[in-house]
Amino acid sequence: MSRVGKSIIKLPAKVEVKADAEALTIKGPLGELKTPIYEGVSANVENGELVFTRKSEDQKTVALHGLVRSLAMNCVKGVTSGWEKNLEITGVGYRAQKRGKDLVMALGYSHEVVFPEPNGIKIEVADQLKIKVSGIDRQLVGQVAADIRSKRPPEPYKGKGIKYQNEYIRRKAGKTGKK
């Protein structure tokens, strides 16, 4: 039995769920998300609770049972409170700023790095060294944060670059001089 799949999702008062054979549509105060329901798994809304059941006990269906439930839970949390990822910039002369809908970063290259803000995502720059990526779709928020981080990932010697908040960067010792 999938322990994740069999747990029930309690729906907040402001959330509305429509389930059909192929997809789950979840509406909340922050927006609307759609998540797929895979073959062998069905969803039912009963008394303000979202319950997932599976039709067989084969390994693939058991795995998809937990996956569908997790994706639905991410959507419910997304439309009620949203998701966010925080990034930090470390390095002399490295900084970020918003210019219209674009995130413009100086990352030690000969040119500025311009990152356009995708639809459904809000990018904020608190001071020049902190970037906050937020939105209702957890997968999209994580992907956009990873794309921003990939513009200058942290290096192991001084830790310069863009890293997630609370990310640990393994440091390496520099060269030891000639003796």
Curated annotation (Swiss-Prot):
GO terms for molecular function: rRNA binding; structural constituent of ribosome. InterPro entries: Ribosomal_uL6-like (IPR000702), Ribosomal_uL6-like_a/b-dom_sf (IPR036789), Ribosomal_uL6_a/b-dom (IPR020040), Ribosomal_uL6_bac-type (IPR019906), Ribosomal_uL6_CS (IPR002358). GO terms for cellular component: cytosolic large ribosomal subunit. The keyword Protein biosynthesis does not apply. Keywords: Ribonucleoprotein, Ribosomal protein, RNA-binding, rRNA-binding. Signal peptide: none annotated. The keyword Mitochondrion does not apply. GO terms for biological process: cytoplasmic translation. SUPFAM superfamilies: Ribosomal protein L6 (SSF56053). It comes from the Bacteria. Belongs to the universal ribosomal protein uL6 family. NCBIfam families: L6_bact. This protein binds to the 23S rRNA, and is important in its secondary structure. It is located near the subunit interface in the base of the L7/L12 stalk, and near the tRNA binding site of the peptidyltransferase center. Part of the 50S ribosomal subunit. This is Large ribosomal subunit protein uL6. It comes from Leptospira biflexa serovar Patoc (strain Patoc 1 / ATCC 23582 / Paris). The lineage of its organism: Bacteria, Pseudomonadati, Spirochaetota, Spirochaetia, Leptospirales.
